[in-house]
Swiss-Prot record:
GO terms for molecular function: DNA binding; DNA-directed RNA polymerase activity. Part of the RNA polymerase complex. This is DNA-directed RNA polymerase subunit Rpo5. NCBIfam families: PRK09570.1. The gene is rpo5. One of its GO terms (cellular component) is DNA-directed RNA polymerase complex. Disulfide bonds: none annotated.
Length: 78
């Protein structure tokens, strides 16, 4: 059976685990706490592929017709 990367599929946006510095900047920009971010399960196939663990924040960069690209942030939970 051939293994392929989910991230190589055109319908899957770019996912990356944020560093503490990047996260701090985003949280202060939006005046929120980490726990207020939308959630994503650690069992999500993309989380498994990028090696995200509970407590990480994943930055998702999607293509947007109006903005070109738009960033979304998700807190990894159990």
């Amino acid at each position: 059976m051939t293994k392929f990367s989910l991230l190589d599929h055109e319908a899957v946006p770019k996912h990356e685990i944020m560093s503490e510095g990047e996260l701090k900047s985003v949280l202060s920009k939006y005046f929120i706490e980490k726990e207020q971010l939308p959630k994503i399960k650690v069992q999500d196939p993309v989380c498994k592929e990028i090696g995200a663990v509970v407590g990480d924040v994943v930055k998702i960069t999607r293509k947007s017709q109006t903005a070109g690209e738009a960033d979304y942030y998700r807190l990894v939970i159990e």
